[in-house]
Structure formats: C-alpha cells, structure tokens
Amino acid sequence: MARVKRGVTTRARHKKVIKLAKGYRGRSKNCYRIALQRVEKALQYAYRDRRNRKRFFRSLWIMRINAAVRQHGLLYSDFIHGLSLANVTLNRKVLADMAVNHKDHFKQIVDLIKEALNKSRVAQ
C-alpha cells in the first residue's frame, strides 16, 4: 500500500484558518495555532450574536413604537391590542419604520386604533 503524505491537506486546512483570521492583530493573523483559537472564538461570537441581533432589533422596534404612540396619548399595550381589534396586520418592524419616517401615516393608524378601542369599550 502506498504511503499517504498529508502535507497538501494540512496546508489547505491551515490556509483556510489563516484566511478567516485576516485582519486580526499580532500573531493571531499568521500563527496557525493562535489563529485557530481566535477564529473558533470569533465563530462562536458570530453564532451567538446572530440570535441576539433578532432580540435587539425587536426591542428597538418596541421602544420606537412605544415612544411614538405615547406622543399620541396611547400606551404600547393598548396600541398592540387595538391593532388586533382594528384588523391591522402590520408587524413591529414596519410600524417602527412608519413611526420614525412617516409620522403622518402612523398618526392615521393610531387614529384608526383609537376608534377600534373606543368601539370595543362601548360594546362592553
């Protein structure tokens, strides 16, 4: 059986790690063993923060909607409840964008929700 020399595969594996470590400081960018540790940790951070980004943006949208809704005399919880009463199917991302960039359209939605809330209170 022929002898297997692993230099080619080792070189390819090392190149892959060094390529991922591009831009790092010190020996982290060109010393394989150190670069491997840094790259593994960076990939762990990336995996974690892809999930955290979703949480962060949802909370940011809620804060923006809450601030805009309070300017019109409503609470966030009442606003969200009114959305379902008025059959408005806009998500928080779109509502937050409207609250920041299209204030007149957002005010129309708030007025629509206020009417829906008043109708539900009268019906009770």
From Swiss-Prot:
Described function: Binds directly to 23S ribosomal RNA and is necessary for the in vitro assembly process of the 50S ribosomal subunit. It is not involved in the protein synthesizing functions of that subunit.
Record GO terms (molecular function): rRNA binding; structural constituent of ribosome
PROSITE patterns noted in UniProt: RIBOSOMAL_L20
rRNA-binding listed as a keyword: yes
Protein name in the entry: Large ribosomal subunit protein bL20
Record family assignment: Belongs to the bacterial ribosomal protein bL20 family.
GO annotation, biological process: ribosomal large subunit assembly; translation
